[in-house]
């Protein structure tokens, strides 16, 4: 079986005069982009410019929605009700959809950011709120998620799910990410990160902090653009995936290939 994977990164995470990461350089590596929608980062002009550039080069656009937390960059827990999570998700998808429409493209997926992304993996009420918002807005959208509650809630509503493998983050034995507040949560050795990514895609496993080879699905690899050496690392990961015989493809193609393979083996 030929392995295929999508490459995605979080883009448009500046605000006003401030920028974060080198989005233009990173776009050369990607097939998809999670674009900040103004709640943890991003503003109308940044959203407009980022969507326009993605449309120009054929990178799929996704809504990177978050808790309303500009000061904390969406990485702090907030005591929102599930219905607030639902309406905040709808609001942010709608905002990005407007820019996508203006530039002759559309939304392809959604991807919860930061603390919200962590919580929807373990909280059924938040997971159902996000999945319900997506289902009511556009049932063709792919939900990017780790294995967990959001993936389950989205599938229960008949939505397509893309499982995210995070290249530079440490995993616990239960499949959750080591919190950023803990030592070793973010990996920095480029060789180790590239090797882990290739294994994740070709072997379907990730080495945990406990030393286990944890089975994982991986439809898309999340590359971070806001860490030192991020562009060189992203290019190395892409290069080593290609060397390993992995096809880099848009997420819709990756999911279609896996669905066809499942049908063929049934």
Question: What is the predicted role of each segment?
Answer:
Residues 19, 23, 33-40, 71-86, ...:
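Glycine-rich tight-turn/loop motif centered on a GG-T
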Residues 199, 230-248, 252-253:
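C-terminal helical cap(s) of enzyme catalytic domains, especially alpha/beta-barrels
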